Amino acid sequence: LMEALRRRDPQARFTFLGGDRMAAVAGTAPVVHYSRMAYMGFSEVLRHLGDISANLRTARRALEEARPDVFIPVDLPSFNLKVAKTASKLGIKVVWYISPKLWAWKKWRLRSIRRLVDKMLCILPFEPDWYAANGYDRAVYVGNPSVEEIDRALARVDVYLQQESDEATVEV
């Protein structure tokens, strides 16, 4: 996503929570590295509640200081809905990339989405219709980066196979 934004606007500046690849694109370090946010399971989250709270405070403070044109949360609804609330209070547009899977669980979060999220960018083609049927009409399908990467890889395999003999073997 950051690479695509950078191509559209080479002067774009990023304040972000993420990893090394994002840092390379942004040309700056993350406010919080994702390795300090990667907690799964009830007991692990419980053990790191202090870190999670500190990360949340850091994210909110970064929004207040940077005052970006747009806040783009990616998935992680438990954390990002709280940050989106801060962004919304600051008058910062919220454009969510990779919709939380509300259709599978925690549909009640839709109330917050309606209130806080200006645009939902979905990677599954049925999601905009699901959102519309549930009273949120600002969701759009933007394609799935994983599928697009697989398509590019398959295209490279096709080219390779066309160049090789009939006995070419491809291992996946």
Residue ranges and their predicted role:
Residues 1-164, 168-170:
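Active-site and donor-binding regions of nucleotide-sugar-utilizing enzymes
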